[in-house]
Curated annotation (Swiss-Prot):
Identification of the protein by name: L-lactate dehydrogenase
One Pfam short name: Ldh_1_N
Binding positions (NAD(+)): 17, 38, 43, 69, 83-84, 105, 122-124, 147
Keywords: Allosteric enzyme, Cytoplasm, NAD, Oxidoreductase, Phosphoprotein
Pathway: Fermentation; pyruvate fermentation to lactate; (S)-lactate from pyruvate: step 1/1
Role according to the record: Catalyzes the conversion of lactate to pyruvate.
């Protein structure tokens, strides 16, 4: 497995998610050069100007430019945020047909440049579109990563932190499966400030109802946000920046992403949300969590849901 070289990033798609990611990236000073590609040239020009004016106050300088696909040739990463937007009431899986075609076009142009880095995909439905990018690119599986359940896990940790009045950084809990309606919480391995959530459940049976409500709020958060403001952006932008940092700083840190399975959880040939160790090679390894029989049953349902959609296109 080869390491990606340099800190240049090409961002494809400067909508709400893409710009939020670019803003987070600049504030964290991770890229030397951020080239942005978007079909709306006028709006892109305004975003590039606006971001560059903010770079003045960042801790380190990021050169932000209007990009072309030729910029991908020497990029360490290509981050895809482009695609048809999710409409109010529309599930992520309903976006498949439109966005698979968009991915095929984008990936063809990227690979024609000679790109040899890492793809990070955020377009929805992210698990299936990450699989599409892998198939269309011909790259090794570990160099194609989806944002997966990074945002869902963050939402879950935040809400658990609110319940127990601790910082989210002291909450260790994962959402796995599809980034969408069939995802599931892994309560069996979750800890709050080092205390097992399973142990808390044993002591307080009524806690189960509160946790189920928190999970439902986590799962449905995107629908509420989209209904209120049209799209999700800041949370996923920060999540993408976290994955980017893990890659470019070669951190070998476990992050909940969409990764290709090779027998983990008894599944293969699908991209799905699970913790994975990430570094400059992309995904070093998938982390297979020890989950209960009930959690496994729900995970299998999630995997089958994705597979049924995926097989219509691949």
């Amino acid at each position: 497995m080869k390491e990606t070289v340099g800190n240049k990033i090409v961002l494809i798609g400067a909508g709400d998610v893409g710009v939020a990611y670019a803003y987070a990236l600049i504030n964290q000073g991770m890229a030397d050069h951020l080239a942005i590609i978007d079909i709306d040239e006028k709006k892109l020009e305004g975003n590039v100007m606006d971001l560059n004016h903010g770079v003045v106050w960042a801790d380190s300088r990021t050169r932000v430019t209007k990009g072309t696909y030729a910029d991908c040739e020497d990029a360490a990463m290509v981050v895809i945020c482009a695609g048809a937007a999710q409409k109010p009431g529309e599930t992520r899986l309903q976006l498949v047909d439109k966005n698979v075609k968009i991915m095929k076009s984008i990936v063809g142009d990227v690979m024609a440049s000679g790109f040899d880095g890492i793809f990070l995909v955020a377009s929805n439905p992210v698990d299936i579109l990450t699989y599409a990018v892998w198939k269309f690119s011909g790259l090794e599986w570990n160099r194609v990563i989806g944002s997966g359940t990074v945002l869902d896990s963050a939402r879950f940790r935040y809400m658990l932190g609110e319940l127990y009045e601790v910082a989210p950084s002291s909450v260790h809990a994962y959402i796995i499966g599809e980034h969408g309606d069939t995802e599931l919480p892994v309560l069996s391995s979750a800890t709050i400030a080092g205390v097992s959530l399973s142990r808390m459940l044993d002591k307080d049976p009524e806690l189960e109802g509160r946790l189920e409500k928190i999970f439902e709020d986590t799962r449905d958060a995107a629908y509420h946000i989209i209904d209120a403001k049209g799209s999700t952006s800041y949370g996923i932008g920060m999540g993408l920046a976290r994955i980017t940092r893990a890659i470019l700083q070669n951190q070998d840190v476990a992050v909940p992403v969409s990764a290709l399975l090779h027998g983990e959880y008894g599944e293969e040939d699908i991209y799905i949300g699970t913790p994975a160790v990430v570094n400059r090679r992309g995904i070093r390894r998938v982390v297979e969590l020890e989950i209960t029989d009930h959690e496994m049953e729900r995970f299998k349902h999630s995997a089958n849901t994705l597979r049924e959609i995926q097989k219509q296109f691949f």
